């Protein structure tokens, strides 16, 4: 009998495998992405101190009124621009990109490219 694979469980395994190699430092923190069906979230994390330095999502009041639906590529681009803007304000220019076990495609790719256009280097 063929068992159906749980895609979220596979994603979590990929994420743990990647997290063994990638970690954020105070000089170069980690840009983490989480994607749900309706929203997308991004955080810049210093793993040494275990603190979130900057966060942005489609649930932010700044973006909530501008974008209608948070689960599309346009919303991901808006979150990427917002996270880059907030990071620059805190003096963060270089980050390590953590795609969270998701494929580098679609909304994750759009967020990353918008963050790069906003001035983040990774």
Curated annotation (Swiss-Prot):
Gene3D superfamilies reported in the protein's UniProt record: 3.30.420.100
GO MF terms held by the record: 5S rRNA binding; structural constituent of ribosome
Stretches of the chain forming a coiled coil according to its record: none
UniProt KW keywords: Ribonucleoprotein, Ribosomal protein, RNA-binding, rRNA-binding
Signal peptide, first to last residue: none
Record has Acyltransferase as a keyword: no
GO cellular component, one term: cytosolic large ribosomal subunit
InterPro entries named in the record: Ribosomal_uL18_bac-type, Ribosomal_uL18_bac/euk
GO biological process, one term: translation
Pfam families, per database record: Ribosomal_L18p
Subunit structure: Part of the 50S ribosomal subunit; part of the 5S rRNA/L5/L18/L25 subcomplex. Contacts the 5S and 23S rRNAs.
Similarity field: Belongs to the universal ribosomal protein uL18 family.
Functional description taken from the UniProt entry: This is one of the proteins that bind and probably mediate the attachment of the 5S RNA into the large ribosomal subunit, where it forms part of the central protuberance.
Matches recorded under HAMAP family: Ribosomal_uL18_B
Protein name: Large ribosomal subunit protein uL18
Protein's organism: Carboxydothermus hydrogenoformans (strain ATCC BAA-161 / DSM 6008 / Z-2901)
Lineage of the organism: Bacteria, Bacillati, Bacillota, Clostridia, Thermoanaerobacterales
Protein encoded by which gene: rplR
């Amino acid at each position: 009998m063929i068992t159906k694979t749980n895609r979220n469980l596979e994603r979590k395994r990929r994420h743990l495998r990647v997290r063994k190699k990638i970690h954020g430092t105070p000089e170069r923190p980690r840009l983490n992405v989480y994607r749900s069906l309706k929203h997308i979230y991004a955080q810049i994390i210093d793993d040494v101190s275990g603190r979130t330095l900057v966060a942005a999502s489609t649930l932010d009041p700044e973006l909530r009124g501008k974008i209608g639906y948070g689960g599309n590529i346009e919303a991901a681009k808006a979150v990427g621009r917002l996270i880059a803007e907030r990071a620059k304000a805190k003096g963060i220019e270089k980050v390590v990109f953590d795609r969270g076990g998701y494929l580098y495609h679609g909304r994750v790719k759009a967020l990353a490219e918008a963050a790069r256009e906003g001035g983040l280097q990774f």
